[in-house]
Amino acid sequence: MHPALLRHHDRQRSGKGSSCRRFQEKPIPREDIRRVVDLARFSPSWKNTQPVRYVVVDDPVLKERIARECIPGQGFNTKTINRAAALAVVTYIPGLSGQGDAPLTEVQAAGWEMFDAGIAAQTFCLAARELDIGTCILGIFDAD
């Protein structure tokens, strides 16, 4: 097992690997964000198509607007977004997963981008944890 995953496993067993909802009030260095995204972008995906994209938002006004307009009525998650130093929005390119695998893609493609995005989100969290950056995956998405 990779040493980073072993350290994560040890944290999980000790209760220190859970989601973080109370963040320090200090910015995350851009270089650290780049490192986390760089590691996460190489997460496994169907046919190695890499359909996942990241948008990192650290502007407080924009984070507040996202919290207000994208997740109305979810007060707890709104507070989590506003307290975080940065918000990483995980997106994907529809129809890209498995591209080039024609027979399978036509039959099984629906939803695989979400699967690939989940793998990438977990890799993102593991990479962030190694830099002592707390994360919290919010299960909020636009189905359209």
Language-model segments: residues:
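Acidic, surface-exposed loops and disordered segments
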Residues: 1-144
